[in-house]
Amino acid sequence: MLNSVKKLLGDSQKRKLKKYEQLVQEINNLEEKLSDLSDEELRHKTITFKDMLRDGKTVDDIKVEAFAVVREAAKRVLGLRHYDVQLIGGLVLLEGNIAEMPTGEGKTLVSSLPTYVRALEGKGVHVITVNDYLAKRDKELIGQVHEFLGLKVGLNIPQIDPFEKKLAYEADITYGIGTEFGFDYLRDNMAASKNEQVQRPYHFAIIDEIDSVLIDEAKTPLIIAGKKSSSSDLHYLCAKVIKSFQDTLHYTYDAESKSASFTEDGIIKIEDLFDIDNLYDLEHQTLYHYMIQALRAHVAFQCDVDYIVHDEKILLVDIFTGRVMDGRSLSDGLHQALEAKEGLEITEENQTQASITIQNFFRMYPALSGMTGTAKTEEKEFNRVYNMEVIPIPTNRPIIREDKKDVVYVTADAKYKAVREDVLKHNKQGRPILIGTMSILQSETVARYLDEANITYQLLNAKSAEQEADLIATAGQKGQITIATNMAGRGTDILLGEGVHELGGLHVIGTERHESRRVDNQLKGRAGRQGDPGSSQFFLSLEDEMLKRFAQEEVEKLTKSLKTDETGLILTAKVHDFVNRTQLICEGSHFSMREYNLKLDDVINDQRNVIYKLRNNLLQEDTNMIEIIIPMIDHAVEAISKQYLVEGMLPEEWDFASLTASLNEILSVENMPSLSANNVHSPEDLQSVLKETLSLYKERVNELDSHTDLQQSLRYVALHFLDQNWVNHLDAMTHLKEGIGLRQYQQEDPTRLYQKEALDIFLYTYGNFEKEMCRYVARHLGVPENVQ
């Protein structure tokens, strides 16, 4: 078996393989000895390992025996014994890499090994799944093994209260969905006190279906939003105006990146319709924002693909699963733009209060690893962004699934008719069939074609992951036909029913190539698990979404030279190369987009870290607020100095009256020294003139040090001002990101410009926070005796 691993891993990973071979042999050598131990003696191994780690041993020192202990515990508790290949998978995870294991190879059992070892360090281990159902299932199953060995296991799901969350995070091993861990991080950094925070510092995480979490979901940031009012009339008006706009004349839409922008003619049309001179003027920023969101809603979002309308409401659809995302809405006025587009009542707009991308959240873990059936095609991204290798793990039994060559048709209608014929053929044999689609709309299209032939099927649009899992689990029964979005029910194996093995197993039909080979492979991998028979075939057309978005012109050229049969099937061989090439272009485009967005988010991530570090410092009861405020006084004076003592202007031109008024706001002194062109010729002169005033004022502020009640008051006020400024900052950053793409047309590097302008905005935000704190202290102190 291990020789087959060598071939699979290739030359570059042979050294690792030798190490795995040796370690697996060492683990196997301990099996007989451990099987002789009583349950109590086996359980006591956990205490022994913890003592060894406390005495200076490392995880590497104990991993062989610890893996053997988990294997023995799983045999006793679950009746399951880890295969050698599963031990290899566990070793890969322990090293912080990705174990690529096909469907049905027991990834859940594999995770029991590294989670146990890293949990022994006492710092907590997080096991990330793609939905609540799988988190509960895996916690209940694998949790039995860890609890048998004396560890505490917790579950972190959205429905539980903060007290339960705190308990879940205090457990040795915590199961949950990645987004909930991320939202808890954001909520902790909005907490009014330390007692409200639930998480502890991150240590080690294992992500199941890691490609889904870190790549597919990486496009969507985690956002906590509050409500703010918006103009319904303006939303409706902008939606109406946009309907009269023509593609390429008034706007451009890049289907590849799903980004839209106005052309010069479009800008002129808006200015004429609203009777304004310059849409880009600051006073028209709101109008521009409403118009660009109306344009995005009109061209980038399709009903029954990206969202559905139900009970007079816009419900967003998860593009990866086809499920409705209850309670989720788009931020920054885009949701309201969709409501206006569909003629629905406009709801309150969301204002971002805290946000983080999936990438930057998981990069906070010192150690990260993951499992999936399909990751090798994205290895470059995993390596570059997360510094993880993808290591394929061999199957316990050979894969005998037959993956048939794609068939490509000229039209979508011809394709769906061919799908129907293929369904009839395999259904007559009694074989179960799984038809994978890309969206709810496509699922319904396939269903309509099957209805025309009176074919009975199960349309999988389940409202909960649990129902999905039940339906997917029965998709392997004799004669069963299931239509599902390709990611639906992921994590649940399709077991073959009685007699199906002899008929040839599950037949999988793909109705369109995805924008990633990885997702195609996931669909194929539904069949042929654990050495079962099975087959797969993709039915494509030149009208498919991927080809329309990434190769429309090439399709038009290609069509002229194609040979087809009477059904519309393309017989020209080069069409397959064309499809494969387009898919690679698509993958590269998405990777570039994620990389670009990550570069932009890295900027705000650095800013977020500064704000959250200060915020957590403010939450500490022993933080001396006066020590924080004293430096702010100097910073605020310096900022005001820069504002009014403008470089390049003569001192006689400086506005000393406004300068004095601003200083009085933050210093609260009765007699501010006289400031004019006579005694202030530079910012340094101002510092000299104010030296005694500042010194005496700081002494008065320092006297507040002993006032405990005031310290607490200052803490709450500082948190309030900081949060308020941060929310406004996020709003400003959103608008900056919106407009930065336009700079490409000015021959400027948008990333560099974004970094520069983001820094300016951040310095303004932080400076404003410091000035507000100084004003508050000045008002509290009141006016003292005269300072001459």
Curated annotation (Swiss-Prot):
<protein>
    <recommendedName>
        <fullName>Protein translocase subunit SecA 2</fullName>
        <ecNumber>7.4.2.8</ecNumber>
    </recommendedName>
</protein>
<dbReference type="GO" id="GO:0043952">
    <property type="term" value="P:protein transport by the Sec complex"/>
</dbReference>
<dbReference type="InterPro" id="IPR011116">
    <property type="entry name" value="SecA_Wing/Scaffold"/>
</dbReference>
<dbReference type="GO" id="GO:0008564">
    <property type="term" value="F:protein-exporting ATPase activity"/>
</dbReference>
<dbReference type="GO" id="GO:0005524">
    <property type="term" value="F:ATP binding"/>
</dbReference>
<feature type="binding site">
    <location>
        <position position="493"/>
    </location>
    <ligand>
        <name>ATP</name>
    </ligand>
</feature>
<dbReference type="GO" id="GO:0065002">
    <property type="term" value="P:intracellular protein transmembrane transport"/>
</dbReference>
<dbReference type="InterPro" id="IPR014001">
    <property type="entry name" value="Helicase_ATP-bd"/>
</dbReference>
<keyword id="KW-1278">Translocase</keyword>
<dbReference type="GO" id="GO:0031522">
    <property type="term" value="C:cell envelope Sec protein transport complex"/>
</dbReference>
<keyword id="KW-0811">Translocation</keyword>
<keyword id="KW-0067">ATP-binding</keyword>
<feature type="binding site">
    <location>
        <begin position="104"/>
        <end position="108"/>
    </location>
    <ligand>
        <name>ATP</name>
    </ligand>
</feature>
<keyword id="KW-0813">Transport</keyword>
<dbReference type="GO" id="GO:0005829">
    <property type="term" value="C:cytosol"/>
</dbReference>
<dbReference type="InterPro" id="IPR027417">
    <property type="entry name" value="P-loop_NTPase"/>
</dbReference>
<dbReference type="InterPro" id="IPR030908">
    <property type="entry name" value="SecA2_Bac_anthr"/>
</dbReference>
<keyword id="KW-1003">Cell membrane</keyword>
<feature type="binding site">
    <location>
        <position position="86"/>
    </location>
    <ligand>
        <name>ATP</name>
    </ligand>
</feature>
<dbReference type="GO" id="GO:0006605">
    <property type="term" value="P:protein targeting"/>
</dbReference>
<dbReference type="GO" id="GO:0017038">
    <property type="term" value="P:protein import"/>
</dbReference>
<comment type="function">
    <text>Part of the Sec protein translocase complex. Interacts with the SecYEG preprotein conducting channel. Has a central role in coupling the hydrolysis of ATP to the transfer of proteins into and across the cell membrane, serving as an ATP-driven molecular motor driving the stepwise translocation of polypeptide chains across the membrane.</text>
</comment>
<dbReference type="Pfam" id="PF01043">
    <property type="entry name" value="SecA_PP_bind"/>
</dbReference>
<dbReference type="Pfam" id="PF07517">
    <property type="entry name" value="SecA_DEAD"/>
</dbReference>
<comment type="similarity">
    <text>Belongs to the SecA family.</text>
</comment>
<dbReference type="InterPro" id="IPR036670">
    <property type="entry name" value="SecA_X-link_sf"/>
</dbReference>
<dbReference type="InterPro" id="IPR001650">
    <property type="entry name" value="Helicase_C-like"/>
</dbReference>
<keyword id="KW-0653">Protein transport</keyword>
<keyword id="KW-0547">Nucleotide-binding</keyword>
<dbReference type="InterPro" id="IPR044722">
    <property type="entry name" value="SecA_SF2_C"/>
</dbReference>
<keyword id="KW-0472">Membrane</keyword>
<dbReference type="InterPro" id="IPR011130">
    <property type="entry name" value="SecA_preprotein_X-link_dom"/>
</dbReference>
<dbReference type="InterPro" id="IPR000185">
    <property type="entry name" value="SecA"/>
</dbReference>
<dbReference type="GO" id="GO:0005886">
    <property type="term" value="C:plasma membrane"/>
</dbReference>
<dbReference type="InterPro" id="IPR014018">
    <property type="entry name" value="SecA_motor_DEAD"/>
</dbReference>
<dbReference type="InterPro" id="IPR036266">
    <property type="entry name" value="SecA_Wing/Scaffold_sf"/>
</dbReference>
<comment type="subunit">
    <text>Monomer and homodimer. Part of the essential Sec protein translocation apparatus which comprises SecA, SecYEG and auxiliary proteins SecDF. Other proteins may also be involved.</text>
</comment>
<dbReference type="Pfam" id="PF21090">
    <property type="entry name" value="P-loop_SecA"/>
</dbReference>
<dbReference type="Pfam" id="PF07516">
    <property type="entry name" value="SecA_SW"/>
</dbReference>
<keyword id="KW-0963">Cytoplasm</keyword>
<dbReference type="InterPro" id="IPR020937">
    <property type="entry name" value="SecA_CS"/>
</dbReference>
<dbReference type="InterPro" id="IPR011115">
    <property type="entry name" value="SecA_DEAD"/>
</dbReference>
